[in-house]
Structure formats: structure tokens, C-alpha cells
């Protein structure tokens, strides 16, 4: 089976690796173009999928759009049986969707129709969902609206971070995709339309959302911290030894106590919220590495959280 793989971030890599490892012929990899990196933006960084594809000698394409006739002709010339799309980052026009003999299949990190869109892992945790999952769907022209081929649910534990859920769903996605490809080969892949009820959208994370609002209930603050960990990272300003610093918050738990929002309630960094309190467990100063709260506090006095 001739496969075109379309993906960009680290989340996509285990799925690409599994497809290669199971002997499928990956004739091309499509990914986002290299991005400027470094302090001055003078270096170009290739995506994780780009790096992995080149390791296996797979031709890599990095168009900025697939809407043009030239790019669509190049894609069609690959004569793919199927395209596998996992966090690619570009919309696929109808000409691309129709080109592979068996269609295009997407690995999506939510239980559709909940959390269609760009940031389903973060949004599920930030909303306090108790479960999510991984789905394989056949793509149509809508935003994550196609019929579902396979799904697996995953419990979201109370302190699970987006990074932990990301890694879990990526591995599940690799297994599901291999099963889906096998069923496609056997012509036994059954498709079920998505439910019409329960549609929500996982908008891309805005940088402004990363600043913690201590006037919110503790459960919302905790969900924001873990939902934005490790990237982009929730943050706040702290008065440390009399100076105000910006600090990233990587882990937390629900704490006990109450007070004016932002009040430091004890020497274990329990912070009062609009309702209840949150205990900060892992923090990161600018230019530093993430540290457990006890180590973060060594020789430091936090008097205020803003």
C-alpha cells in the first residue's frame, strides 16, 4: 500500500514510525516548512516529522499551501493509495482529499465531535474533562467532521498534564492507525458518522490564556496549569526576596485554605484562589529549569503572587 504521510509535530512521529515499521511504503512525507529559530531567528529548524522522514530516506515536501494547481498535481503524481494526516497544520482542499485511491484518514486526539480543531489535548484538560481519547476518521471538507473508523478512550486523571496525555494519545494513535490500515487493506474498515450533538471546538491556545488569573476557582486554575504544561506553560508574577519575577507553573495540586486571591497561605506555596486554593508543585524561573516547589523555595522567600 502506497502511503503519503502528512504531519508536523512530535505527536505525529510515533504514528509515522509505526507505519514504516509495519512495512507500508511511505512514498512521501508532507510537513510544515522549516521555521526560524535561535535568538535572532537566523537558524531554520525542521519539524520532527521532517527529521524522522529523512532518517528513513522518505522524500519530504514542505509547501506553505495546497490550494494551488501545481501543488495538487505534484500530490496526485504520487499515486498514493491513502494519505494519513496527523497534526499537519494545513487544510486539505477537495482535490487533495480526492487524490488517494482510498481517501485521507486523520488521527485526532479527542472523542469527536467534542474538541474539533487545533488544541484538543489542552482544551480537554483545561475544561476539566474526565476522559478523552484518540480517533481515526476519514476526512471530508469540514473541520474534523468526517466519519469515524476507530476510537479508544483514555481517562484523564486529576493531576495529569497535557504533556503526559500527549504522549499517551500519540502511542495509542500509532496502534489505532496500524489497525485502521490493516482493515483498509482487507476492505473491512467500517465508518460511523459523528454525533450531531455535543460539538465543541478546541481553538488554538492564545498566549494571553497562559497568565493565571487567581480570582478564578481553584479547580479552574489547576486545570489551566496542567492543561498548559509543558507548552506554552502557565505563568504568573511572584514577589521573590522583594523583587517581582515571572515564573512558569508546570505542576500543581488542589490545596486547602482560603484568602484573598494570590495570597501565599503557607511555606509550601499554597496559593489562595477566588474559591479554594492551589498548591504549586513544579515551577520554573526565567532561564532556569523546572524545579519541585521545595527546591524552588530553597533560599527564597515568596511573599506575593500576582
Swiss-Prot record:
Pfam families tied to this protein: Formyl_trans_C, Formyl_trans_N
EC number: 2.1.2.9
Annotated (6S)-5,6,7,8-tetrahydrofolate binding sites: 110-113
PROSITE patterns linked: GART
Keywords: Protein biosynthesis, Transferase
First-level EC class: transferase
UniProt keyword annotation of Cell wall biogenesis/degradation present: no
GO molecular function, one term: methionyl-tRNA formyltransferase activity
Sequence similarity: Belongs to the Fmt family.
Protein name (record): Methionyl-tRNA formyltransferase
Species this protein is from: Brucella abortus (strain 2308)
Taxonomic classification: Bacteria, Pseudomonadati, Pseudomonadota, Alphaproteobacteria, Hyphomicrobiales
